[in-house]
From Swiss-Prot:
Motif position, DEAD box: 165-168
Annotated protein name in UniProt: ATP-dependent RNA helicase RhlB
Quaternary structure and interacting proteins, as annotated: Component of the RNA degradosome, which is a multiprotein complex involved in RNA processing and mRNA degradation.
MF terms in GO: ATP binding; ATP hydrolysis activity; RNA binding; RNA helicase activity
PROSITE patterns linked to this entry: DEAD_ATP_HELICASE, HELICASE_ATP_BIND_1, HELICASE_CTER, Q_MOTIF
Gly residues composition bias: residue spans: 410-421
Domain Helicase ATP-binding: start-end pairs: 40-219
EC number per UniProt: 3.6.4.13
Annotated stretches, region: Disordered: 395-435
Function: DEAD-box RNA helicase involved in RNA degradation. Has RNA-dependent ATPase activity and unwinds double-stranded RNA.
Family stated for the protein in its record: Belongs to the DEAD box helicase family. RhlB subfamily.
PANTHER family assigned: ATP-DEPENDENT RNA HELICASE RHLB (PTHR47959:SF10), ATP-DEPENDENT RNA HELICASE RHLE-RELATED (PTHR47959)
Length: 435
């Protein structure tokens, strides 16, 4: 569970079920983040909330604690059947659902409550077998949940707690009809605890909340501060000819411990992966076309430090909770201002420092004014010395074939294959020319 800066509010001060308190202590959670400190007092009084909070603010722990506590302190509905979960958590992406389920297991192992997860891209029958054994808390994407509802595998008439996470992205991805379909199959709003979280509480998100929740209380966390003060931002204006060389040079100079490179299209991400892989980096690729099992494996490798760089589109990376990301590179400036905030919010978490490097190239530079207006500050410009860029870049690898590690041919060194080297290549940090 990712954390941000903490408050003086302790979890121990809340009237939580003893098993929840034990789970929090053993998991190392003592102090609340702002969203937890504001939302839990409301939720523990069995009141609904609509919370505005970015990824990385601790909202996942907030709604999981509230959900588990509600189920442990509320009688099980009379006549509840094995195929009737008591709580449901809806997420816009498979990766987010998987992360929520992993976090939920930290609480589940202390409480005896069973967590089940369902999402597309994995075996329908394998997931069904888990559901057939009965789950208390169902976590998943709306499409797969609807499949099981229509087949009678699960029944939502015993739901006592509902979480809708990243509601704004649900709208972006066109899932709102699915959400309304599921809400109509649950008990009335006043018979359950309802929680909605969103990066923005737009009018359409608020309308959804008031349609399907019981007079929710609005909770907002620092709405005026879109980006963390822990993140150092800078922007370059590269030519299209220099763009790839600049990225490879900066990565070699910065030598990030764990970095995510964002691009706007699948094709561009594949091209980036091919060049980074060809340059000897340990890099993974996340786009919508990557099979689910491979996506999970790549994320595990990145989390464990077996990969140093992850190349991703916004949709593929939405909802990821990965700790210790030191650098974010925006190879393309996003078309959506909120995506810029989501991207750079992958770094600078838990009080750590982070670095965000953006490229305003000829194709996407027009997106910059809107982004700076949205984040309410200008991004410092860094010039670069084009003559200092790498000029001996190996050719990109082919994305559709397996390849053996090859030695780097760069005279200045290069990343050895097979593991993170102890020192970066011997190249002077002379590309940046600060104004």
């Amino acid at each position: 569970m990712s954390e941000t800066h903490l408050t003086n509010q302790k979890f121990a001060d809340f009237s939580l079920h003893p098993e929840i308190q034990q789970a929090l202590v053993e998991s190392g959670f003592e102090y609340c983040t702002p969203i937890q400190a504001l939302s839990l007092p409301i939720l523990l009084e069995h009141k609904d909330i609509a919370g505005q909070a970015q990824t990385g603010t601790g909202k996942t722990l907030a709604f999981l604690v509230a959900t588990f506590n509600h189920l442990l302190t509320t009688p099980i509905p009379d006549g509840r059947q094995l195929n009737q979960p008591r709580a449901i958590v809806m997420a816009p992406t498979r990766e987010l659902a998987i992360q929520i389920a992993k976090d939920g297991e930290l609480l589940a192992k202390h409480t005896g409550l069973k967590v089940g997860i369902v999402y597309g891209g994995e075996s329908y029958e394998v997931q069904r077998k888990v559901l057939d054994k009965g789950v208390d808390i169902l976590i998943g994407t709306t499409g797969r949940i609807i499949d099981y509802v229509r087949q009678g595998v699960i029944n939502l008439s015993a739901i006592q707690a509902v979480v809708l996470d990243e509601a704004d992205r649900m709208f972006d991805l066109g899932f709102i009809k699915d959400i309304r379909f599921l809400f109509r199959r649950m008990p009335d709003a006043n018979e359950r605890l309802n929680m909605l979280f969103s990066a923005t509480l737009s009018m359409k998100v608020q309308e959804l909340a008031y349609d399907h929740m019981n007079d929710p209380e609005k909770v907002e966390i620092a709405p005026s501060e879109k980006t963390s003060k822990n993140i150092t931002e800078e922007i370059f204006y590269p030519s299209m000819e220099d763009k790839m060389r600049l990225l490879l040079t900066l990565i070699e100079e910065d030598w990030p411990e764990k970095a995510i490179v964002f691009s706007n299209t699948k094709h561009s991400c594949e091209n980036l992966w091919a060049h980074l892989e060809g340059d000897g980096h340990r890099v993974g690729l996340l786009t919508g076309d990557v099979p689910q099992k491979k996506r999970i494996r790549i994320l595990e490798q990145f989390t464990k430090g077996e990969l140093d760089i992850l190349v991703a589109t916004d949709v593929a990376a939405r909802g990821l909770h990965i700790s210790d990301v030191s650098h974010v590179y925006n190879y393309d400036l996003p078309d959506d201002c909120e995506d810029y905030v989501h991207r750079i919010g992958r770094t600078g978490r838990a009080g750590q420092k982070g670095v965000s490097v953006s490229f305003a190239c000829e194709e996407y530079a027009l997106n910059l004014p809107a982004i700076e207006h949205y984040i309410q500050h200008s991004i410092p410009v860094t010039n670069y010395d084009s003559e200092a860029l790498l000029d001996d870049i190996p050719p990109p690898v082919r994305i559709h074939r397996k390849h053996s590690p090859r030695p780097t041919g760069r005279s200045g060194g290069g990343k050895p294959q097979g593991g993170r080297p102890g020192a970066r290549p011997r190249r002077h940090d002379r590309t940046r020319r600060h104004s």
